């Protein structure tokens, strides 16, 4: 099994739509760290699990310096973002989304 990991640093803002009163319902920003883990039994014809540049272009290209509420079709919680990122990247099996020090959400395909 081959494993690769891509770490992305993204600046972006969001506002959460919550069923309770929270300061997170106000527009605010984070310096996000999104870690994408991919795996494959075989390598593609170029000798890779997936191209790191493709991950960066697909994820950072859309999210970096964006208001996530404007570009994502769901409530942009860290958990929802983790799942969305995993769905966007070929051979992805896990994503960790850190919105601030100590606050990390993960999505993993078992």
Each predicted region: which residue ranges?
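Charge-rich, low-complexity N-terminal segments
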Residues: 1-110
């Amino acid at each position: 099994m081959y494993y690769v990991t891509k770490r992305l640093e993204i600046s972006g803002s969001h506002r959460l739509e919550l069923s309770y009163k929270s300061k997170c319902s106000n527009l605010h920003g984070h310096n996000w760290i999104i870690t994408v883990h991919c795996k494959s039994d075989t390598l593609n014809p170029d000798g890779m699990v997936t191209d790191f540049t493709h991950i960066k272009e697909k994820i950072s290209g859309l999210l970096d310096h964006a208001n996530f509420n404007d570009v994502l079709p769901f409530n942009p919680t860290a958990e929802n973002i983790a799942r969305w990122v995993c769905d966007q990247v070929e051979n992805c099996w896990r994503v960790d989304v850190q919105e601030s020090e100590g606050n990390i959400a993960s999505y993993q395909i078992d």
